[in-house]
Amino acid sequence: MDREGLKKVQSERLIETVERVYFNVPYYRHKMQEKGLGPESIRSIDDLGRLPFTTKQDLRDNYPFGLFAVPMSEIVRIHASSGTTGKSTVVGYTRNDISTWSEVMARTLTAAGANRNDFIQIAYGYGLFTGGLGLHYGGEKIGASVIPISGGNTIRQIELMRDFGSTVLACTPSYALYLAEA
């Protein structure tokens, strides 16, 4: 796709997103109206800078579900931050969100060189943190063998690397260094 084609797709998707949040999330509608904006004000990706941006405080102020753009009946999974610096930030996912997330992570793994012959050891936490599950689904989508060990348990991590022949390690850079030194 050439640059103009990409800009066209980005503009179309931005317009759709702005319309969806304007009509489905009262908080965003109010923020846009404060800036004198309506959905018709955004016509291309060039207008992105005119939009109010979401801050962590906005997420906290609308805890837990105030920024969801769909009814709760469409939310199939909820993730949240740990809340170590304040109120947790909450994200709700629809089935389509999960599918898109899986596709994005599959592309990310492929771009990094992973393929169906790999053993992907996921040492990110599972649970409310989003890291482990996204890579898990992305790995399955490319046909790789996923080892969902989660975080911590360093001795077991190293044992499984050796026993299973892990070829991809998904974890934080600091934990990778820690494993290398263990």
What is the predicted function of each stretch?
Residues I75, I98, G125-G127, S174:
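Short glycine-enriched loops at secondary-structure junctions
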Residues Y93, A123-Y124, I149, C171:
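Small/polar loops that bind or transfer phosphate-bearing groups
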Residues M1-A80, T85-E103, R107-A111, R116:
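Nucleotide 5′-phosphate-binding alpha/beta core
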Residues E16, Y27, K35, L133-A182:
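Conserved adenylate-forming
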Residues T110-V146:
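Conserved AMP-binding loop of ANL adenylate-forming enzymes
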Residues I42, F53, N117, I158-R162, ...:
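Short secondary-structure transition/capping segments
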